[in-house]
Amino acid sequence: ERMKTALAYVREGHLGRCLVAKAWESTKQGSIGRQPDGEAPKEVDYDMWLGSAPKRPFNPRRFHGSWRWFFDYGAGDLGNDGVHRLDMAFAALSAAVETEGGEPLRMPRRISGTGGKWYFDDAQEWPDTMQVTYEYPGTPPRILTYEMRIWSPYKYLGEGEGAAVFGDRGYIILGNRGWRAYTNGGKMVKEHGGD
């Protein structure tokens, strides 16, 4: 419902011409720490759990709850939560482009990124800080940026996790529990709660 009403608002043309969208994760997550390898719990068929992943000794940090932080099993926070925020930003930016008479966005023509494991001193392998830029073809091109700071104790545009699309007449912020629309002067003109 949240995305349906947000996209309807964007398709009504309230944002004007939109060139840029942003998705972000700026919620503080704790360190996963370091633990020594050990024995898998008796009720776990660890070989089955590993599947086709490289064989590694059992470690509680590479198991349920934190497996996503290791190259062999997951994709870090970009693949865990980031994909949901990117999906919101992409859908709203594509709706804006279509409203302007353009083709829906498809594959980016260029992707660049930077980041690293700069904050946590723990067993996690994936970055804890990252910025990625997706450039979509068109005249003019459109840009979607993703920013991840999983050590950050503060919100961005009022949301710890979210997406936004910026136009020359206004912008929309999409959060986990609803969305808010603003004029180009920053006055909130519409708010919608719910999932």
Regions found by a protein language model. Name each.
Residues K4-R11, G16-G76, N80-D195:
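Contiguous beta-strand/loop segments that form the cofactor/metal-binding neighborhood of enzyme cores
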